[in-house]
Each structure stands twice: as structure tokens, then as C-alpha cells.
């Protein structure tokens, strides 16, 4: 019999690149994954977070202690192709996952993680891990789950130390759509679920660097036929589709690596008068195309409670964020205006091209999960299109 004071044998490990070993209880997929560790401060929306393609190459530490209480369902998914498993490769929880209790629950988080191939662990001090990230930055690590508790610790340490990290890594090519498609699903409505678009009134081409479903839903809900194209689609092919607007999506990895093929395309598109709107990685792509620079952040911004100031209105919005790279505002050339800034650290959160229908934001106005303070940006984009077509403007805020 095991003595009451004996330490429980761990069935999961988080091994950091500096050799630190954190022991926990495993759940989700068995095996291991090497990635960068970040933390997310959102209280809700764990399915949307873990399926957001922007988290590719990352292990998400949830600062809220109770994750999984409402189970999982087939609707709260953000990646376009769940079979491709675009999104986080690992997850770290404080409390053990309990049986779900929610009218929408269709399954247990543990089983859902297994199906998604996400390696997870629970039962650790997530506050201490978050403090470590805040102090030292986002570490490279290996997360491993073995139900029998048998690990090759030397191998795990070697893999964690050897991984080069996200700098220079183009992950958009790993999570983008394989072929063009048309999106017609509209936002979720209480007691009705998601809708189906009827007759679209305008055409938006969305370049998919790892786009989230809710972005596409909001565009469709405003009357846009949304054609989603792979990240490496050329400008001639895009322009041949005769879009009324161009959307540059969110996505994972180093923007400068993705920019090798994405920036020339965006620069060609900017030679036209077609309105352009970018979010997250798309924001960074636009900044690079305009001559700016990006840089890796110390701890990144991941959560649903970030204050951002809109310089154009003077208002403060609470927004969702998910990025580990940021645009260097000092690198922006003349004619590019900084429109939004983070009130946490002063980093750039938005730009606009003076006198042109071109703008982007670093944060996620579609939320999912998170507040809807910035939903008006989708209406602003559609209004730029409608203005160009001589059509009546939508109310920007409803």
C-alpha cells in the first residue's frame, strides 16, 4: 500500500527548455508535443481558444482554475478544418476536469482533447507558471502524457532545449485552407443556432492565414459573400475574383516568415482602390507590406480582458487578444497612422493608411471568446465597401 504521505506518481510532465520539470496529472492525448508556453487569462471559451489556429505551435496555460466544467460541443470550434487539428498542441489546467454540467454539453473535455490530439495536464500551480512566464518570457517546452507514468526525462529535456522556437517559423502555411471555398454561415442566435446567408450583397475575399470561423460569420452576417482563399494565393487570382473588399486574416507564427510570400501579394492589392481590413497576423502582414517591422514580444497578449484605446475616438475598448509578435509603431512610414494602442504596455494595436480605405487591428474584434466592444470594425469595413459603391451606410454601432 502506498503511504498517505507519498507523492502521487505523475502521469504528465511539462519540461521547460531550461531543464525545469513540472509534474501533473495527464489528460487528453497521450504522447508529447514541443511548443512555446503562453498563458491565457480568459474565464470562458476554452474550446474556441484551443481551436484558434493562431495558437498553432503553442501550449496554453489557463490562468482561470476551473476549465472544462461546461463540457464540449460541436459548435464552439474556430478552425475551418477540425480534421487538420489546427490550434494549440497542449493545454495546462490548475484543477482536474470534472464531469460537465451545461445544456449544450455533448461530451467531456478529456475525450474532446484526445480527439483533437491535444496533450494536457492538470493539478499544477498555474499561478507560479504564469509568474515565471511574466518574469522570463514564454519558454519553449515539451508537454508529455503517459498513463503509466514512465518518461524518458533526458530525451524530453533535450527536445525542449533543442527546439528553435517560433521566430522564423511560418505556421500559416500549415493551417491555411487547402483550396478556395465560399463561406455562408452567419452568427449564432439564441435558441436558433447558426444561420445561413440568403442573398449576399457584396463580395469579400478572405486570405486565410489561419482564419477563425466567427470572423467569417460576422462578415457573412453583414451581407458579404466570403470567398476564403489559401495563404499563398497570388494577387492576379484574387483580383480575378472581382472582390469588393479584401480581408487579411489572423494566424500563427512569425509574421516576417509568412511575409516572404504574403507581403508581395498584399503590396499588389494595395495598388488598387479595393478596401482592405486585417486582423492579428493580417494586421502584421499589412504593416510589413507598408514598410513597417514586427518583433517578438516578451510574454505576448492572450486573453479576453485587454484594454485598448482607439486614438480616432478617444474611447477605451475591452478586447480579446492572442499574439506573440507585435508591430513596431516607430517603424511605420509616413502616411500610416497608429489608430489603436494597448493600455497594458503601449504596444501597437491598430493602423490605417491615410486617405485610403485600408486599416487593421492587432486584437480580435470578433472575440469568440470575449467582449464585443470592437464588433463595429466589421461594419466600418463593410461601410468602406458600400461607400465606394455609392450605397447607404450601415449604423457603425448597434
Swiss-Prot record:
First-level EC class: ligase
Signal sequence, renumbered to the chain: none
The enzyme's E.C. designation: 6.3.5.5
GO BP term, pick one: L-arginine biosynthetic process
Start and end residues of each Glutamine amidotransferase type-1 domain: 203-391
Record protein name field: Carbamoyl phosphate synthase small chain
Catalytic residues (UniProt): 280, 364, 366
Pathway membership: Amino-acid biosynthesis; L-arginine biosynthesis; carbamoyl phosphate from bicarbonate: step 1/1; Pyrimidine metabolism; UMP biosynthesis via de novo pathway; (S)-dihydroorotate from bicarbonate: step 1/3
Superkingdom of origin: Bacteria
Catalytic activity: hydrogencarbonate + L-glutamine + 2 ATP + H2O = carbamoyl phosphate + L-glutamate + 2 ADP + phosphate + 2 H(+)
Family assignment from sequence similarity: Belongs to the CarA family.
Region described as CPSase: spans on this chain: 1-199
Self-association and partners: Composed of two chains; the small (or glutamine) chain promotes the hydrolysis of glutamine to ammonia, which is used by the large (or ammonia) chain to synthesize carbamoyl phosphate. Tetramer of heterodimers (alpha,beta)4.
Protein source organism: Mesorhizobium japonicum (strain LMG 29417 / CECT 9101 / MAFF 303099)
GO molecular function: ATP binding; carbamoyl-phosphate synthase (glutamine-hydrolyzing) activity; glutaminase activity
Residues at which L-glutamine binds: 54, 251, 253, 281, 284, 322, 324-325
Record-linked InterPro entries: Anth_synth/Amidotransfase, CarbamoylP_synth_ssu, CarbamoylP_synth_ssu_N, CarbP_synth_ssu_N_sf, Class_I_gatase-like, CPSase_GATase1, GATASE
Coiled-coil boundaries: none
Role of this protein: Small subunit of the glutamine-dependent carbamoyl phosphate synthetase (CPSase). CPSase catalyzes the formation of carbamoyl phosphate from the ammonia moiety of glutamine, carbonate, and phosphate donated by ATP, constituting the first step of 2 biosynthetic pathways, one leading to arginine and/or urea and the other to pyrimidine nucleotides. The small subunit (glutamine amidotransferase) binds and cleaves glutamine to supply the large subunit with the substrate ammonia.
This protein's UniProt keywords: Amino-acid biosynthesis, Arginine biosynthesis, ATP-binding, Glutamine amidotransferase, Ligase, Nucleotide-binding, Pyrimidine biosynthesis
